[in-house]
Regions:
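Conserved helix-turn-beta segment of the N-terminal RecA-like "Helicase ATP-binding" lobe
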Residues: 214, 491-517, 684-687
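Conserved pre-motif I regulatory segment
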Residues: 391-395, 413-416, 422-461
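Conserved interdomain hinge at the start of the Helicase C-terminal
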Residues: 630-671, 678-681
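Conserved RecA-like P-loop NTPase helicase motor core
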Residues: 695-794
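Conserved helicase ATPase core of P-loop NTP-dependent helicases/translocases
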Residues: 494, 510-521, 538, 677-678, ...
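Signature for HUH/AEP ssDNA processing cores
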Residues: 37-38, 54-189, 196-212
């Protein structure tokens, strides 16, 4: 009896010792997550040696429930890993009962699974999780729920610096008080930082928490890239049309675990000894705590830490109050008395001695939120390939490079911080040229030129017909150094050639061109198409040889090829010319970064004759309707049906013939070549002179069309039919007085360009007319008209 009791006590003591040892292991495991940061590299092979027993062993229903209680996403569908034996490629797709079933599965037709009419998704079950943990399959979940909520947030790190970046962010989460878990990814060459919520929260709030963590981490880690903002799970606030949002692979997959991967790590990148114990110990973030964290983050502007630009402004951005610019919180810690910078093709700031927080602030001078990301998100389109942030800063081993136009903002930032800028100017002076301006500027043009000549770089914003090319010629004479004029179309190249010969007192042989049939540069004054200077992703060396660069229609600068040309050029003077600074994609800040601030705008007037014109908008309501079962049809589908609508087209044709009978000089604009051809064929023989112009015309056809146009007497009937993209920029025909807008647009910059074709002064011109065809029975097209109407009214048009 005593022996049995003694044996029982011995067993109890042994059991208690085991439990105590287990608790110590768990305490050490959890303690390692809060130990001092270390980024000692641990290879996959080392990870395999020190990996604990596989989480897939000794599985119980309790452990599966624990797993599912943390890794919660959609339960009506999950993603399954596939691999191709032929190509070796891998990927994930929604698990579907009909996958690759002959005559049912639509994958071969490139149809998205979420849109497939034959889809029959397999729900996520305990058995599915069991198979994943035992290594029978690899699965991922879709964290974003249909109602725009989520139970978790994850941040992915997959660059070469993933170890340092992940550990740095983990350190930030501790400082802020956000519980997080550090997992090595399936490949072994990346990591996930996981955060879990006690209940479903708004995906927007969860993602803002992730952005806040990244922004704060950048103040202590100088190498964390801006692209980190695009590595969140979920990656958008609402479920995109035809999809589920991004997926994330689940941890504890047995095959990966056997290699030391998909396990939770300590700061030394070693797998924790008790994976299940650690998971059970992870604290979940309550909605109240999340709300408090975001309130503090928003108060200090630290969710993204950059401004929004002026993408959604209706007013002119150059006239806006400074409050649109982002106000950063004060920097903590010691700051240098001065920083050293070199101004060349970019503004190079020496990194030496600068804290990560200051470097981060400097980089953000050249960063802004990407309006296209938010536009797609609001339309419930996928944002997978659309970055949330645009950063034009460039990192070099010992310098940070900012675009030249950021100099003023950098000086302002450093002034606020009490730091002097020691700037060395390494821009070449250029080659002196002898020329003079032989024209006469109007008083308004003189005022603009006076503002521009006071600065090394800047932008002139002026309406069509105000003489921007003439001002450009004046600036060439005023600078008196060799000049490169950049254009994006051959038509503009030819116009600049003519205008410079007209307004500059210089031998025509010294005005060269790069691109086009007469490719001959002089090194003194050259006009170049952007395409001729950027071939095979390489910028031509010649761009570095000019002391003065003029960028015509500079609102095209954000195009990657155009931006690269300016990024590599080293001019002392840059002048941007445009009628509208705003872009549909919201990338306007890049224009200012490359060309400098707006130095003169809006006050520049056209000639008195142009100002005296009466502007009339004639609204023509159509009967066009678009009936579909889709609640939100694609615009191109609407356009396809609209351009073939007989009633609508007949209305436009009748109006054109009436205008011609009234002796007007009209132009019809459409966005589709087939629409243009329809009107050309129907009007053939009914118009004395008809000129058809469109993008993609060969040089000979374009030259013959323009010669025909210029040969028509002012008193003779004529009609121009063109695509809007061809006419929008550089087309100059003062006789035009009537516009037929045959296809709807909404962007105010486009309307400004189109209306500008009519508003050039011409003898006897007293009134200009715009016929706008309003498709009020199609809600999307009616909304577009309302946007156009605001622009018309702003330009002084009276609606009748």
């Amino acid at each position: 009896m005593i022996d049995r009791e003694r044996d029982s006590l011995v067993m109890d003591v042994a059991r208690l010792k085991d439990e105590l040892e287990s608790l110590r292991d768990e305490d050490n495991a959890i303690g390692s997550i809060t130990s001092p940061t270390s980024c000692e590299h641990v290879s996959v092979e080392e990870g395999k040696k020190i990996a604990p027993a596989s989480p897939g062993e000794h599985l119980t229903s309790e452990r599966i429930r624990l797993f599912l209680s943390f890794f919660k996403g959609r339960d009506d569908v999950y993603a399954r890993l596939w691999s191709s034996k032929r190509s070796g490629k891998e990927g994930y797709s929604p698990a579907c009962k009909n996958e690759w079933v002959q005559d049912i599965c639509e994958k071969k037709k490139k149809m998205r699974c979420a849109s497939c009419p034959s889809r029959e998704f397999i729900p996520l079950t305990d058995e599915t999780i069991m198979n994943h943990l035992e290594g029978l399959q690899t699965i991922g979940i879709y964290p974003l729920l249909p109602e725009g909520r989520c139970h978790l947030l994850a941040i992915d790190f997959d660059k070469d610096s993933w170890r340092e970046d992940a550990v740095a962010l983990l350190g930030t989460s501790r400082l802020i008080g956000i519980p997080a878990a550090f997992e090595r990814s399936r490949s072994g060459n990346g990591a996930h930082i996981w955060m879990f919520f006690s209940e479903a929260v708004s995906a927007r709030d969860a993602r803002n928490l992730g952005c806040y963590l990244i922004t704060e981490t950048m103040s202590s880690n100088r190498n964390l890239p801006m692209s980190s903002y695009d590595r969140l799970f979920p990656n958008q606030d609402s479920v995109p049309k035809g999809g589920f949002g991004n997926l994330i692979a689940l941890p504890f997959q047995k095959e990966a675990v056997d290699k030391g991967n998909t396990l939770f790590l300590d700061d030394d990148l070693r797998p924790l000894p008790d994976q299940w114990g650690f998971l059970a110990s992870v604290e979940r973030i309550t909605p109240g705590k999340l709300e408090g964290l975001l309130r503090e983050a928003n108060k200090h502007g630290q969710v993204l830490g950059v401004g929004t630009g002026f993408a959604d402004m209706d007013e002119q951005p150059w006239a806006a109050k400074p409050s649109w610019r982002f106000k950063s919180p004060p920097l903590q810690g010691p700051l240098p008395e001065s920083i050293i910078a070199v101004l060349g093709n970019q503004l190079y700031i020496e990194k030496g001695g600068l804290s990560p927080a200051l470097l981060n602030r400097i980089r953000r001078v050249a960063a802004f939120q990407n309006p296209e990301f938010y536009k797609k998100q609001n339309l419930r389109l996928s944002t997978a390939l659309t970055p949330r942030m645009i950063c034009c800063a460039e990192d070099f081993p010992h310098h940070v490079g900012l675009p030249r136009g950021c100099l003023d903002e950098l000086i302002e930032l450093l002034g606020e911080l009490g730091i002097d800028l020691d700037l060395r100017d390494e821009r070449p002076l250029g080659i002196d040229i002898e020329t003079s301006f032989r024209g006469e500027l109007t008083p308004q043009q003189k005022a603009a030129a006076s503002d521009l000549v006071s600065y090394d770089m800047g932008v002139l914003v002026a309406p069509p017909g105000s003489g921007k090319t003439v001002i450009g010629a004046y600036m060439i004479a005023a600078r008196a150094i060799n000049t490169l004029v950049l254009v994006h179309r051959r038509l503009l190249l030819e116009q600049w050639q003519q205008r410079l010969q007209e307004f500059l007192d210089i031998e025509s042989s010294l005005i060269g061109q790069i691109g086009g049939p007469k490719d001959r540069s002089t090194g003194f004054i050259d006009i170049a198409t952007m395409q001729s200077l950027f071939r095979k992703k390489q910028v031509a060396d010649v761009v570095t040889e000019y002391g003065h660069i003029i960028v015509d229609e500079c609102h095209h600068v954000p195009a990657i090829s155009f931006e690269q040309i300016l990024r590599n050029a080293r001019p002392r003077h840059v002048l941007g010319l445009t009628a509208t600074l705003k872009r549909r994609d919201g990338l306007h800040p890049i224009i200012l970064m490359q060309c400098g601030a707006v130095r003169h705008a809006s006050g520049l007037r056209r000639s008195d004759d142009s100002q005296a014109l009466e502007r009339t908008l004639i609204r023509r309501d159509t009967e066009f309707a678009y009936e579909t079962e889709e609640t939100d049809p694609f615009i191109h589908d609407i356009y396809d049906r609209m351009i073939n609508d007989e009633g609508r087209n007949s209305l436009i044709l009748a109006d054109i013939l009436s205008a011609l009978e009234a002796g007007r000089s009209p132009i019809l604009l459409t966005g589709r070549r087939e629409h243009l051809q329809f009107f050309a064929s129907r009007l053939e023989g009914n118009v004395r002179n008809m000129i058809v112009l469109y993008g993609g015309m060969d040089a000979k056809a374009r030259r013959l069309a323009m010669e025909h146009l210029s040969s028509i007497p002012d008193t003779e009937e004529r009609l121009i039919i063109a695509t809007g993209s061809y006419i929008g920029e550089g087309f100059d025909d003062p006789r035009l007085d009537t516009l037929f807008l045959a296809m709807p647009v909404s962007f105010d910059g486009t309307i400004t360009q189109y209306a500008g074709r009519l508003e050039r002064p011409f003898l006897g011109k007293k009134e200009v007319l715009i016929y706008d065809y309003v498709d009020a029975k199609v809600p999307m097209l009616l909304r577009m008209y309302k946007k156009r109407l605001r622009t018309y009214r702003g330009k002084g048009y009276r609606e009748v």
